[in-house]
């Protein structure tokens, strides 16, 4: 029976989570540019910070790009409305 040291185990976990983060970032970029048709520099917008991770997980190949775009427009409008209401 082989024993795995805790250092080896933590290194394996780090490798797995590192590749998962890379895949997640790749999905976010594909969603941003491919589905939404936005420039990569738009990823820093606070609404997109919430929007991208949520929908990148749901993106499964055959997607209705129009539905995602309409949802983004709705979220941007709500954000703008709340921002203006809060500053009055």
UniProtKB/Swiss-Prot annotation:
Residues 1-30 are annotated as: Disordered. It holds the Pfam family HV_small_capsid. Residues 9-19 have a biased composition (Polar residues). One of its GO terms (biological process) is viral process. InterPro entries: HV_small_capsid. Keywords: Capsid protein, Host nucleus, Virion. It is found in: Virion; Host nucleus. Disulfide bonds: none annotated. Its main location: virion. Participates in the assembly of the infectious particles by decorating the outer surface of the capsid shell and thus forming a layer between the capsid and the tegument. Complexes composed of the major capsid protein and small capsomere-interacting protein/SCP assemble together in the host cytoplasm and are translocated to the nucleus, where they accumulate and participate in capsid assembly. This is Small capsomere-interacting protein. The gene is SCP.
């Amino acid at each position: 029976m082989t024993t795995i040291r805790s250092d080896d185990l933590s290194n394996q976990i780090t490798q797995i989570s590192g590749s998962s983060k890379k895949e997640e970032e790749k999905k976010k970029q594909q969603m941003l540019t491919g589905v939404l048709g936005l420039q990569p520099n738009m990823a820093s917008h606070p609404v997109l910070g919430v929007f991208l991770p949520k929908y990148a997980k749901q993106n499964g190949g055959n997607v209705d790009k129009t539905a995602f775009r309409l949802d983004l427009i709705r979220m941007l409008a709500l954000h703008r409305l709340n921002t203006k209401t809060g500053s009055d």
